[in-house]
From Swiss-Prot:
Its main location: cytoplasm. Keywords: Amino-acid biosynthesis, Arginine biosynthesis, ATP-binding, Cytoplasm, Kinase, Nucleotide-binding, Transferase. The record marks 38, 255 as: Transition state stabilizer. Pathway: Amino-acid biosynthesis; L-arginine biosynthesis; N(2)-acetyl-L-ornithine from L-glutamate: step 2/4. Transmembrane segments: none annotated. It is found in: Cytoplasm. HAMAP family: ArgB. The gene is argB. PANTHER family: N-ACETYLGLUTAMATE SYNTHASE, N-ACETYLGLUTAMATE SYNTHASE, MITOCHONDRIAL. Substrate binds at residues 73-74, 95, 194. Its EC number is 2.7.2.8. One of its GO terms (cellular component) is cytoplasm. Catalyzes the ATP-dependent phosphorylation of N-acetyl-L-glutamate. This is Acetylglutamate kinase.
Length: 303
């Protein structure tokens, strides 16, 4: 059979055009919308996934959306502590954070992880600006404890975000920038705490009145009975999620709590998606199928 290079090229071009056209209704729907994206998991370790994520953020911005990135950096913090010969300890799933450890957390999150992502985004133009929860009073934290065997246990300078002042982020959005937020935050006395990036992202999405919260993780979405692959949930509402929370795997709880807080606080939809898939954010925002698990306000999930 004779090959037809021209026909093959046209066929490939037509396929690309159909992909672009599929995005049209979503471009119309989300033009001008704010999307808060929690960056974490393999997406912030694998070099190819890092590059793809940065491209996604630039694509969103140039397509008329306003992405806001919130990131943690657990693996990088652990690696730096080991490099410095400092002992790392976890209690009840939380990192024990001494003042010395907090210095490392601050250095790694804002000075390493945040700067790297800002640099990757800015390879495509002067879009990204790094900031932390300390800047312009963005986050205020309250110290928290861990629970071990039913008992409250001190874990040092670990906090929950209790208030958000989004003015500085809104200023950057209005200037056409992509804010990249490191999750460290002072308490009312100015003592800086390490705060969970998932819950910080949920709080920021609520405060910004975002259209979407997107949380990257290392699984396909929410499983009600992990590791049973058939228990993957693609869509549920806030009431359904709240009922499931006590039985979820510990690593998924803060992500789903962030989604719950966001939709309870007025964000129309929140998503947990597989960050191991390159360009998963674009697939979520601009395709009909979407990816991962979508959380909706109460009364709008699948029954």
């Amino acid at each position: 059979m004779t090959e037809n290079p021209v026909s093959d090229r046209l066929s490939t071009a037509a396929e690309k055009a159909s992909v672009l056209i599929e995005a049209l209704p979503w471009l119309q729907r989300f033009h001008g919308a704010t999307v808060v994206v929690k960056y974490g998991g393999n997406a912030m370790i694998d070099d190819e996934l890092k590059t793809a994520f940065a491209q996604d953020m630039v694509f969103l911005r140039l397509a008329g959306l306003h992405p806001v990135v919130v990131h943690g950096g657990g693996p990088q913090i652990t690696a730096m502590l080991e490099r410095l010969g400092m002992q790392g300890e976890f209690r009840g799933g939380l990192r024990v954070t001494t003042p010395e450890t907090m210095d490392v957390v601050r250095m790694v999150l804002f000075g390493q992880v945040g700067r790297e992502l800002v640099g990757l985004i800015n390879q495509h133009g002067p879009h990204a600006v790094g900031m932390s929860g300390e800047d312009a009073g963005l986050f205020t934290a309250r110290r928290r404890t861990a629970t071990v065997d039913g008992e409250a246990v001190d874990v040092g300078l670990v906090g929950d975000v209790v208030s958000v002042n989004p003015d500085a982020v809104l200023d950057l959005i209005r200037a056409g920038r992509i804010p990249v937020v490191s999750t460290i935050a002072p308490d009312p006395d100015g003592v800086v705490h390490n705060v969970n990036a998932d819950t910080a992202a949920g709080a920021l999405a609520e405060a910004l009145g975002a259209e979407k919260l997107v949380v990257l993780t290392d699984v396909e979405g929410l499983y009600t009975d992990w590791p049973d692959r058939s228990s993957l949930v693609t869509r549920l509402d806030a009431d359904e999620l709240e009922a499931l929370l006590p039985g979820l795997a510990s690593g998924m709880v803060p992500k789903m709590e962030a989604c719950l807080r966001a939709v309870r606080g007025g964000v129309p939809r929140a998503h947990v998606i597989d960050g191991r898939l390159a360009h998963s954010v674009l697939l979520e925002v601009f395709t009909s199928a979407g990816v991962g698990t979508m959380v909706l306000p109460a009364g709008t999930g699948e029954k």
